[in-house]
Amino acid sequence: VFSILFIVGMVNSVNLTDGIDGLCATVSAVVCAFFAVFAFSVGDMGAATFSGAVIGGLLGFLIFNIYPAMGDTGSLFLGGAVTGLAYMLKYELIILLVGIVYFCEIMSVVLQVSYFRLTHGKRLFKMAPIHHHFEKLGFSESKIDLCAFAITAVFCIAAFFLIKY
């Protein structure tokens, strides 16, 4: 039961990340790169190949089709792909670290709704998910994408060293 809830939650959190152009694809490309390197380091060529194929598709998407956002079909596939990779490699919970942006997106929605109900209409963020909050603060989509890329890359590198050493 926990696995089913975890998978559905992760897939939906990746879907929430697809609120601005390029965000879901950028973050997912970095997460898949982590899984490709990790899979290669443990000798799982199937997972490494699948990760590489997803990265290739995402790079093509980012170059040729960044506008409009990919939609639910693409983001739900990516959620299933990154969660499936975590399960294939037997490191299910590592997705909470390497997918920190996904986790922050879904938690911002949970916190916003909870706070709104507890305070009878007050908001914790200007808008949820969190990437829309940053948009309301004046950040451009490309700046939000770049920050999410950097945060994801740092957490993926940390996760790799945490696992390997």
Which residues fall in each region the model found?
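Alpha-helical transmembrane segments
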Residues: F2-Y165
